[in-house]
């Protein structure tokens, strides 16, 4: 009996995911039982506030739907355990998950340990388990405060928007500020008045007999009579050209100086997301899903499961001394000693960084991308290759450049020519950094040298409005303004799109009408919540809680009272969009009453003013989008051209009440004349694959595709054959690999 008890008493380790569990189990061996919680197991209730404001913001937590079985299995697993190790992620969210596990499972403090590590490698895991600690309640309190703040804003503001704007809308403490940034940029672009200006480019070359004779280069007109000058119109530009054609072009000054171009630091979360978006078109969510898999571990054949990168939610740029030594050895061996700096490069972090965090880097730089490519999906390889190259380049010698500047005088006009050339490639061998296509290398010039004028080209230009935010530039702006943290950038970008407040078109953000209306009303009635600086200060306050500089209740009290007053005032003073409904020059086709413009969560639509007697509605659509005089065969409303994830199609203007739609291509295809032979191009092709927007539950970064097999339809991963996930039915969002 004692032997049986001894056998059943093991140490239990709890992590978030099955993939992470498998990698850690391989390292720890049979002495440990490693279990997965499948992420969060408890949260505030869905259908109530879940916060007792009058009792010091006491939260009420409920086990999440579908997680009862997980909790029951974990309770059974820890019942006879000698020790329980909570090995969730090392950030605030991971600490909160560990605390919730301890509470939900009723774990005794003397048997419960917290282990944290930055990478899932044998060295790191062994070190973490050799010195376990206790749950950091400062981190837990900071995460609790964030969750309650977000719940207060979302749960209390959303009903106001339903009442004043449209049902189904929602507001968020951080997301609403991000939407504001897009809306304000939209207004700047709309209000921008372009101004015409002209550039004059001279093509010049040293004269015969001079060094580099005949080597052409370009110079731009920059000054007239010592003052900055750009012609305002074509007439002024042509007048300048006529004057310049008579002038002698002389070198006033020529300078050459050597400069260096250092590689940027290894990746933080935000820079990884920005670079992956710009380079591969990955959404922040997709980037983080792929990075999660690389961190938790992948099978490398005979080498087994290996964690390939360090923890991917970080704003730190520091690197461990062991990793620095390893990368310096690789640079010396692979590229030569001339590419290795005398001392390692150390980078200064922005803001407040946790000491335990590192930059995102490979767990072993010796594991070169091409060597493990066969074991990775295409997207996993892209991201790993990006991380590996960024880390290696950051510790290589800089690119050495020769910068050239020539100032050229032509009568009362001054031209400027700039050039650069690479003297030593440095990190560019890895980073791929290079000169821009339009950069030139100037010939050898000297002061007072007379040049040959080979041509003058005036070109028309217009001042440009501020650029629209891309995914990368919006994340960069959020980070620079102190809004959000590494774990929140991806959810922010996803949420503002899912709510319909912004849309992403050709990788650029556009504010929707609903987003603009909601933003304007929130700015007017909740200036603090919508203020960028206020939101940044709240983030700093949460950092203070984590660092034990303030109590989490102080943060909540400071926020809640002004928010409550603003909410009460808005209930009375905010004008309902329903009261702003305006008649349009159109009569209801059903009853002849005037139509009015109204607002829903999807945007404006037309409705009959005789509602509720007449319930006719129609999508408010631009005239050019109407599909001629075609009517819906189901309800007689107009058919309009709409855009979906797979292109344009015809849909009913009365959507969502009428869901009729048809292929636009089918209507555009020419009819085959009667009796004409059937051509190959006219044959109907069998549809064998149908993409979806559902992420692969295996976490490989792919999307699910509906395919047809010998036994009927099934769902498979777009990364096949690297990912072999399949399912008979479409999984629900958030389903894990182990659920399938």
Can you name each region flagged by the protein language model?
Residues 1-147, 156, 235-238, 347, ...:
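Intrinsically disordered, low-complexity regulatory segments
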Residues 288-292, 493-494:
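Short, hydrophobic-biased segments on the C-terminal half of alpha helices
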Residues 164-168, 183-232, 279:
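C-terminal helical "lid" subdomain and adjoining coupling/linker elements of P-loop NTPases
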């Amino acid at each position: 009996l004692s032997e049986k008890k001894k056998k059943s008493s093991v140490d239990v380790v709890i992590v978030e995911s099955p993939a992470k569990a498998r990698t850690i189990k391989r390292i720890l061996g049979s002495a440990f039982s490693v279990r997965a919680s499948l992420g969060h197991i408890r949260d505030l209730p869905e259908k109530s506030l879940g916060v007792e404001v009058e009792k010091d913001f006491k939260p009420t937590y409920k086990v999440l739907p579908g997680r009862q079985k997980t909790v029951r299995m974990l309770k059974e697993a820890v019942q006879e355990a000698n020790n329980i190790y909570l090995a969730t992620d090392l950030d605030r969210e991971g600490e909160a998950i560990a605390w919730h596990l301890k509470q939900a499972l009723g774990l005794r403090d003397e048997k419960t340990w917290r282990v944290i590590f930055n990478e899932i490698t044998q060295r790191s895991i062994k070190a973490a388990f050799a010195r376990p600690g206790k749950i950091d309640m400062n981190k837990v309190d900071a995460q609790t405060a964030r969750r309650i703040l977000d719940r207060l804003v979302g749960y209390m503001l959303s009903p106001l928007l339903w009442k004043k704007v449209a049902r189904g809308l929602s507001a968020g403490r951080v997301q609403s500020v991000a939407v504001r940034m897009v809306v304000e940029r939209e207004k700047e672009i709309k209000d921008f008045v372009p101004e015409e200006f002209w550039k004059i480019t001279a093509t010049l070359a040293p004269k015969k007999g001079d060094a580099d004779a005949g080597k052409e280069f370009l110079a731009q007109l920059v000054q007239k009579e010592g003052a900055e000058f750009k012609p305002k119109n074509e007439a002024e530009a042509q007048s300048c050209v006529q004057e310049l054609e008579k002038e002698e072009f002389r070198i006033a000054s020529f300078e050459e100086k050597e400069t260096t171009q250092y590689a940027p630091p290894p990746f933080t979360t935000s820079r990884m997301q920005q670079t992956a978006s710009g380079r591969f078109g990955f959404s922040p969510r997709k980037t983080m899903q792929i990075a999660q898999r690389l961190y938790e571990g992948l099978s490398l054949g005979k080498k087994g499961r290996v964690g390939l990168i360090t923890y991917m939610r970080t704003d730190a740029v520091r690197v461990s001394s062991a990793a620095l030594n390893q990368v310096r050895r690789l640079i010396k061996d692979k590229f030569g000693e001339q590419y290795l700096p005398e001392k390692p490069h150390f980078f200064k972090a922005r803001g407040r960084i946790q000491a335990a965090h590192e930059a995102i880097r490979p767990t072993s730089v010796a594991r070169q991308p091409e060597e493990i490519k066969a074991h990775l999906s295409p997207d996993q390889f892209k991201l790993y290759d990006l991380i590996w190259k960024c880390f290696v380049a950051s510790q290589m010698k800089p690119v050495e450049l020769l910068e050239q500047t020539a100032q050229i005088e032509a009568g009362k006009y001054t031209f400027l020519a700039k050039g650069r050339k690479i003297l030593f490639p440095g990190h560019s061998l890895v980073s791929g950094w290079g000169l821009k296509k339009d950069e030139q290398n100037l010939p050898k010039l000297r002061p007072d040298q007379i040049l040959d004028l080979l041509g003058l080209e005036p070109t028309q230009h217009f001042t440009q409005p501020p650029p629209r935010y891309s995914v990368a530039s919006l994340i960069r702006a959020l980070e620079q303004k102190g809004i959000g943290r590494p774990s929140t950038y991806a959810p922010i970008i996803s949420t503002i799109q899912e709510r319909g407040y912004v849309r992403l078109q050709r990788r650029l953000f556009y504010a929707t009408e609903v987003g603009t209306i909601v933003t304007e009303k929130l700015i007017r009635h909740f200036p603090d919540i919508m203020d960028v600086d206020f939101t940044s200060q709240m983030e700093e306050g949460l950092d203070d809680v984590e660092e034990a500089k303030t109590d989490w209740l102080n943060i909540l009290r400071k926020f809640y009272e002004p928010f409550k007053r603003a909410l009460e005032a808005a209930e009375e003073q905010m004008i309902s969009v329903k009261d702003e409904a305006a008649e349009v020059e159109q009569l209801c086709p059903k009853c002849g009453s005037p139509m009015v413009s109204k607002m829903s969560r999807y945007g404006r639509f037309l409705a009959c003013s005789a509602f509720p007697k007449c319930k006719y509605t129609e999508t408010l659509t631009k005239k050019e989008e109407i599909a001629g005089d075609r009517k819906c065969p189901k309800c007689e409303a107009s058919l309009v051209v709409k855009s979906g994830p797979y292109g344009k199609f015809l849909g009913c203007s009365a959507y969502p009440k009428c869901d009729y739609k048809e292929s636009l291509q089918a209507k555009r295809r020419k009819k085959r004349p009667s009796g004409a032979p059937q051509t190959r191009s006219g044959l109907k092709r069998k549809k064998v694959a149908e993409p979806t927007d559902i992420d692969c539950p295996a976490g490989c970064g792919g999307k699910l595709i509906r395919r047809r097999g010998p036994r009927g339809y099934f769902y498979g991963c777009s990364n096949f054959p690297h990912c072999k996930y399949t399912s008979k039915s479409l999984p629900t969002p958030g389903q894990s690999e182990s659920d399938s």
